[in-house]
């Protein structure tokens, strides 16, 4: 679900926190990717010409494997080293959001069934995409594929995006990559969005710098988390009638969500607090997420197991052997070279005062005389 309206607020108040670039601009970087999020994207986006998901001869869905294989290779070819982080058990507070998603899928199924044979291809596809969910089996298949590709995986104890942020904060990777804006609540130095999107979509990668984002909003870490909860997150519903502009204004005026709650309770306002609203529990989940300390995680990129890839992807899943072998060669080449150093990793960029940059006219004349 993410945090509704947060993207726009940061763009409005912290434009310097945003950068847009292409995949190649991340060369030399290690990135922790929210695996569950990108598997969901692959199941929706990787389709046949008729709009149906990719399947093998046995009718098993293979869109997630195709997307994971080729997008990972594209990153490695650009000298990027990905690590995929998988969700663990969901927090108890997330149960309400998961139940809502289930109800939305059930409603989509009813609407699709109601169309019968009279619905257009576009209408049917719209409801089919709403029915998409990543199964446990698909998660395990993705892990197996990545292992054979030589790409490291991490099983998070709880939320994958929190673990991605921990790896970034701990210096194991450069950034956390996820489409969920609430990843910023876990303080990754950088959040990357659209990293696993197909290049055919021609959508640049967004980079958001956490430090610049909260500086532009002029908020503390605690106020930023309160803002995200007020906007609506996976852990608790939002307050009806409070959108992004009002949420920002209220945090500025009252300083904290506790004060806002008291203000709503003690004054005749048009806002009504949800019954038993667990905002403080949600805050604690963001402040103290259940993660494995980055220092305890050892990330290793290995040479791909070509025979294993052929057995799994070709013999079991029905992919083209030529394409899998070609992909494996690209992986070998990319991973063998290692991550090349970036210039900004060796040199510290120092801003030069414009006045100092301009040569003194007297000095210039003097130097010319010496040359003569």
From Swiss-Prot:
Any Gene Ontology biological process: base-excision repair
Record Pfam families: XPG_I, XPG_N
Compartments, record wording: Nucleus, Nucleolus; Nucleus, Nucleoplasm; Mitochondrion
Primary subcellular site in the record, as a coarse category: nucleus
Cofactor binding note from Swiss-Prot or TrEMBL: Binds 2 magnesium ions per subunit. They probably participate in the reaction catalyzed by the enzyme. May bind an additional third magnesium ion after substrate binding.
Region feature (Disordered): 353-372
UniProt entry tagged with the keyword Transmembrane helix: no
SUPFAM superfamilies: 5' to 3' exonuclease, C-terminal subdomain, PIN domain-like
Example of a GO MF term: DNA binding
Amino-acid positions noted as binding Mg(2+) 1 in the UniProt annotation, renumbered to this chain: 34, 87, 159, 161
Name of the protein: Flap endonuclease 1
PROSITE patterns, A to Z: XPG_1, XPG_2
Enzyme class name: hydrolase
Role this protein plays: Structure-specific nuclease with 5'-flap endonuclease and 5'-3' exonuclease activities involved in DNA replication and repair. During DNA replication, cleaves the 5'-overhanging flap structure that is generated by displacement synthesis when DNA polymerase encounters the 5'-end of a downstream Okazaki fragment. It enters the flap from the 5'-end and then tracks to cleave the flap base, leaving a nick for ligation. Also involved in the long patch base excision repair (LP-BER) pathway, by cleaving within the apurinic/apyrimidinic (AP) site-terminated flap.
Organism: Candida albicans (strain SC5314 / ATCC MYA-2876)
Annotated region described as Interaction with PCNA, given as residue ranges: 339-347
InterPro entries the record matches: 5-3_exonuclease_C_sf (IPR036279), Flap_endonuc (IPR023426), HhH2 (IPR008918), PIN-like_dom_sf (IPR029060), XPG-I_dom (IPR006086), XPG/Rad2 (IPR006084), XPG_CS (IPR019974), XPG_DNA_repair_N (IPR006085)
Annotated positions binding DNA: 47, 71, 159, 232, 234
């Amino acid at each position: 679900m993410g945090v509704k309206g947060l993207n726009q607020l940061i763009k409005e108040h912290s434009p310097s926190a945003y950068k847009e670039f292409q995949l190649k601009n991340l060369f030399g970087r290690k990135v922790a990717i929210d695996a569950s999020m990108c598997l969901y994207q692959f199941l929706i986006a990787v389709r046949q010409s008729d709009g149906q998901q990719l399947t093998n001869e046995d009718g098993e869905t293979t869109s997630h494997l195709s997307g994971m294989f080729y997008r990972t290779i594209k990153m490695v070819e650009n000298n990027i080293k990905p690590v995929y982080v998988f969700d663990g058990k969901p927090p108890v507070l997330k149960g309400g959001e998961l139940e809502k998603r289930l109800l939305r899928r059930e409603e989509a199924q009813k609407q699709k069934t109601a169309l019968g044979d009279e619905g257009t291809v576009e209408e049917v596809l719209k409801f089919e995409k709403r029915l998409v969910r990543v199964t446990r089996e698909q998660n395990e298949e993705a892990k197996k594929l990545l292992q054979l590709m030589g790409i490291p995986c991490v099983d998070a104890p709880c939320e994958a995006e929190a673990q991605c942020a921990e790896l970034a904060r701990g210096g194991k990777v450069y950034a956390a990559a996820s489409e969920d804006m609430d990843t910023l609540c876990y303080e990754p130095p950088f959040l990357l969005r659209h990293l696993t999107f197909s290049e055919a979509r021609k959508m640049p990668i967004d980079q958001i710098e956490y430090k610049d984002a909260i500086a532009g909003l002029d908020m503390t870490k605690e106020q930023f988390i309160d803002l995200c909860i007020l906007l609506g997150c996976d852990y608790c519903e939002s307050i009806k009638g409070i959108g992004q502009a009002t949420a920002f204004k209220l945090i500025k005026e009252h300083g904290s969500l506790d004060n806002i709650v008291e203000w709503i309770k003690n004054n005749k306002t048009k806002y009504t607090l949800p019954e038993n609203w667990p905002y403080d529990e949600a805050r604690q989940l963001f402040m103290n997420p259940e993660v494995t300390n980055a220092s305890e995680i050892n990330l290793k990129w290995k040479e791909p197991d070509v025979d294993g890839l052929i057995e799994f992807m070709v013999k079991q899943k029905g992919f083209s052997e030529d394409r899998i072998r070609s992909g494996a060669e690209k992986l070998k080449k990319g991973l063998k070279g290692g991550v090349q150093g970036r210039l900004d990793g060796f040199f510290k960029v120092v801003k030069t005062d414009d006045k100092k940059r301009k040569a003194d006219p007297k000095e210039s004349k003097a130097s010319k005389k010496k040359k003569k």
